[in-house]
């Protein structure tokens, strides 16, 4: 499975592509950070991020995209910009029929380091080790994008099993309701 990991942002947006192999083996194929000037209009910044993401989607053909879920921060304008960038990125993937999954920062940290409260240095160190990189990915947005992709590779089987279980549960509920409705009609 080829996964594109995205750490969304307007000033810096981390992008990565990894491929998983046997077991927990993951190989990094590409990583970069898109930068936009903070003094540019938001629409221009979103367009710049979108253009680069669309190029990456066309060049790398990921099977799935993993985006960091925006969480509440103190700075509302930062949250808005991050959410807007994430929306533009998810839309680009959806237009190509690519599944998009969102992971919280604590899910990513727990998957990569074993500690949902790990700091940036710990995440970067583990990403470097997991991918057997010669150098630490910089800036932190690049490491975060790789961590998101790794997280999804490792969580995808569980996500698929949960979806199957939910679908089976829905079928059982529907069958049970039909049975009960039939029994009610029979008693009338």
Curated annotation (Swiss-Prot):
The keyword DNA damage applies. Keywords: Cytoplasm, DNA damage, DNA recombination, DNA repair, DNA-binding, Endonuclease, Hydrolase, Magnesium, Metal-binding, Nuclease. GO terms for cellular component: cytoplasm; Holliday junction resolvase complex. One of its GO terms (biological process) is DNA repair. It is an enzyme of class 3 (hydrolase). The active site is at 7, 68, 141. It is found in: Cytoplasm. One of its GO terms (molecular function) is DNA binding. Binds 2 Mg(2+) ion per subunit. Its EC number is 3.1.21.10. InterPro entries: RNaseH-like_sf, RNaseH_sf, X-over_junc_endoDNase_Mg_BS, X-over_junc_endoDNase_RuvC. The RuvA-RuvB-RuvC complex processes Holliday junction (HJ) DNA during genetic recombination and DNA repair. Endonuclease that resolves HJ intermediates. Cleaves cruciform DNA by making single-stranded nicks across the HJ at symmetrical positions within the homologous arms, yielding a 5'-phosphate and a 3'-hydroxyl group; requires a central core of homology in the junction. The consensus cleavage sequence is 5'-(A/T)TT(C/G)-3'. Cleavage occurs on the 3'-side of the TT dinucleotide at the point of strand exchange. Belongs to the RuvC family. PANTHER family: CROSSOVER JUNCTION ENDODEOXYRIBONUCLEASE RUVC (PTHR30194:SF3). This is Crossover junction endodeoxyribonuclease RuvC. It comes from Mycobacterium leprae (strain TN). The gene is ruvC.
């Amino acid at each position: 499975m080829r996964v594109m990991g995205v750490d969304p942002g307007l000033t810096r947006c981390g992008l990565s592509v990894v491929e998983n192999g046997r077991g927990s083996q993951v190989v990094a194929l590409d990583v970069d950070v898109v930068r936009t000037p903070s003094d540019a209009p938001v629409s221009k910044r979103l367009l710049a991020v979108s253009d680069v993401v669309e190029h990456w989607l066309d060049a790398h053909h990921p099977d799935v995209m993993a985006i960091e879920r925006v969480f509440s921060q103190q700075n509302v304008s930062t949250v808005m910009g991050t959410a807007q960038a994430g929306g533009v990125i998810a839309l680009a993937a959806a237009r190509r029929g690519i599944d998009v999954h969102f992971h919280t920062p604590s899910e990513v940290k727990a998957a990569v380091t074993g500690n949902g409260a790990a700091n940036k240095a710990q995440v970067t160190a583990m990403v470097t080790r997991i991918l057997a990189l010669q150098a630490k990915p910089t800036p932190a947005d690049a490491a975060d994008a790789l961590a998101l992709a790794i997280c999804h590779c490792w969580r995808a089987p569980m996500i698929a099993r949960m979806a199957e279980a939910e679908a089976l549960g829905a079928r059982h509920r529907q069958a049970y309701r039909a049975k009960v409705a039939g029994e009610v009609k029979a008693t009338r």
